[in-house]
Amino acid sequence: MRIFTEQALSEYIQKHPETKTALQEWKYVVRHSEWTSFADIKKVFNSVDAVGNQRYVFNIMGNHHRIVVVIKFTIYFVYIRFIGTHTEYERMNKTIGAKNI
């Protein structure tokens, strides 16, 4: 998969250095995957949720951090829409809904 907006990961790691290993592992796995469906993602990331509108939520570091991405399976494209703490995600989810992030 191709990850668009990878810079967001680097910026987040600078703010939250404790996430470096987990986010590097996530990025490595995503880059080396060729997902064609949600079922393919679930095989690798059991805790991922499909929230609608082509958006998927990944739990990072035991659900302390979240990444929301748009995935275009036909072109192997992952676009990072949000990365933040669980609390930040919950606040945003209540305000606009995860499928609109």
Show where each model-derived region lies.
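Basic, Lys/Arg-enriched alpha-helical interface segments
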Residues: 1-64, 73-79, 86-101
